[in-house]
């Protein structure tokens, strides 16, 4: 026993060395794991509580989902002259790029190619990986020149230029972008399924993506003195026809104006340049509800046949190469008539109507003298390949949404034919006379553009060509980007009954503004019922908590408008709370960064680290969704239809059938009991 005990004992010297080595290892391990700085026992918790205490709460800012929000939500002006004033050049400031995961569908995007007077480029090429914004309703493509007083173009309000999941502080050459800020959305950790793979790439070119249900329309411009105090912007109809832009306007107005000029053969039919100016009396806020662009319903419609096209001046100058030289200036105006007798002219130019706030006004037009030819010098305008839209003469029913989102539309620039060298109003008058006497009018139109594949928004109305339309319009459907008809037939404008019905239909459909859409490379449905939190940029203040609103088809217009107004009011009510929560999250993000070297916030603060600012956004958002479900998703039945089984006296039929069934069951039960007993 004693010998065994002695065998288990270590020599005293070896025991000391072993104990010293063990203590050195323990102290070294504690020294390595000990955070830098003074940490007391009262502030350091030994247990790991990150996943225990904060399991159902936000324990780290890694749960924030980055989202790009467009500045259009603030109601800013989106026309090119107004937008370019928000951008300026600076030197010595390095660009910054921030990535984000999802974004809104933008109503207006921009694409710039600006050169200096010496021919050098003003804007840098995009870095590798920077692609254009993938969801744009209208792309404003601007080409021109300017002084460009600086190295890079920044946003004067501190906002970002949103590209495809990358937001930059500078504008890149030839790359489509939208103005916006980066926000964060609080999301729980997503559940990963091994059988459901995450999409590797979101399609950039929406025209090639048949599932995008969205159509991109490109508007071309020429601009001089870009970046200077006073710039000049021209809307490009074709290579030789332009429209002077001197006041804010909607993209729908430009689309309709383009179609008006093409339909009425008001393009430059020579190598000279023809520039039209728009009369100040013509309201440029025509078109549909442009998402949230101006927060109002548009009811005015631009008809081409009632506009007054007047040539103001023609300057000629013979050059050595014997080419015609000159600058042609034209003015587009109108003068409403005082009585309805002018609606049916016999020898006068065509007549159309203008719908203004539900009121129909008629007017006559005048044009060039018979056989007058527009000639000018050879110009070298900026070249673009896409014009705003083709000629359209089809009529649209706005109350019936499209059931086929994968239709195609035509949109490409096409030069005027050589046969249109002159503008002869005698031919137009004869055409007008035939329109007055027949129900299938034929109007003179420019050649139909070539087709390029486009996808349609299911919210938009499909325009169907009807018999008797012009050959140019019959070549393909009209553009789905407009809820109201842009160019109506002359015979339609001469019929008061048809005009009145169309006016009522337009005023009704215009109240139905499209819902908001969001594109993302992951799951769009994951953001339902959660709050958008403005984060980056001073322009973030005022961005509403829009949430995710899905498309609705077959809606009752009045109830839909009521639901939209109610949701907007509730969203405004949430702004103050959201901003306070934003500041709290910003402070917490800074704390997480500073305490990362000490093991994280939860390791030092314990259960106090859990972020739980009371958020009632989900409760109110649920109420918003309930309103949308009650008033929008479930259309009310038509009580005027007596053939409906659930209206009138027939609504008692199901109840009667149920009562009869109960009586039969009771009788059968009594019979069975009598037989068995």
Swiss-Prot record:
Q: Which residues are glycosylated?
A: 41, 205, 239, 258, 269, 297, 317-318, 339, 406, 420, 435, 463, 564, 619
Q: Name one GO cellular component term.
A: virion membrane
From which residue to which does the signal peptide run? 1-33
Q: Which residues lie on this side of the membrane: Extracellular?
A: 34-651
Which keywords describe this protein according to UniProt?
Answer: Clathrin-mediated endocytosis of virus by host, Cleavage on pair of basic residues, Coiled coil, Disulfide bond, Fusion of virus membrane with host endosomal membrane, Fusion of virus membrane with host membrane, Glycoprotein, Host cell membrane, Host membrane, Host-virus interaction, Inhibition of host innate immune response by virus, Inhibition of host tetherin by virus, Lipoprotein, Membrane, Palmitate, Secreted, Signal, Transmembrane, Transmembrane helix, Viral attachment to host cell, Viral attachment to host entry receptor, Viral envelope protein, Viral immunoevasion, Viral penetration into host cytoplasm, Virion, Virus endocytosis by host, Virus entry into host cell
Segments forming a coiled coil = 555-596, 616-635
Q: Where is this region: Fusion peptide?
A: 525-540
Q: Where is this site: Involved in receptor recognition and/or post-binding events?
A: 58, 64, 89, 96, 171
Q: What is this protein called?
A: Envelope glycoprotein
Gene that this sequence comes from:
GP
